[in-house]
Regions:
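Bacterial N-terminal signal peptides that target proteins for export
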Residues: 1-11
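Short S/T/G/P-rich N-terminal loop/turn motif that feeds into the first structured element of a domain
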Residues: 16-97, 124-129
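Short, flexible helix/strand-to-coil boundary loops that buttress conserved ligand/catalytic motifs
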Residues: 50, 100, 112
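Secondary-structure boundary/capping signal
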Residues: 62-65, 104, 116-120
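A common structural junction motif
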Residues: 104-110
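C-terminal end-helix/capping segment
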Residues: 110-129
Length: 129
């Protein structure tokens, strides 16, 4: 009788462990890094009209500013660099997409487009293979 309980307990513990591992693995989504390559033509207008609402949107969607600024990048090979780069970090691609939604793209096109040209790239983090 004790052996049956021992086997049942072992099977139950194994199943619980498998379920816990699957749950933890499913929650481990990679961070997403968003790189903005921006050629600003009118710095004063960009900083006054465009930047404040964008910074608010980044914060509201869980973004973290990692690096960037005006004239901070150096080209080591390839094409010349833009005059402004920004690197943001989001917890997941879903958070990055929530930030860079239709409303943000429209604002970038209509307001930001008066002052700058943009290229935005999102990259999932992960291990190099």
């Amino acid at each position: 009788m004790k052996a049956k309980y021992g086997v049942a307990l072992a099977i139950g513990s194994f199943a619980l462990g498998v379920a816990a591992i699957q749950t933890l693995h499913a929650q481990a989504k990679p961070s997403v890094y968003m790189v903005a390559e921006i050629n600003v033509r009118d710095k004063a207008g960009y900083e006054k009209d465009f930047l404040p609402p964008v910074l608010k949107n980044i914060k509201e969607n869980g973004g973290t500013y990692l690096a960037g600024g005006f004239d901070k990048a150096q080209a080591w090979s390839g094409l010349p660099v833009a005059n402004r780069y920004v690197i943001l970090k989001f917890d997941s691609m879903d958070h990055a997409k929530a930030f860079y939604n239709d409303k943000q793209r429209e604002f970038e096109r209509t307001v930001g487009g008066k002052y700058a040209d943009f290229r935005i790239i999102a990259v999932e983090g992960g291990e190099m293979k």
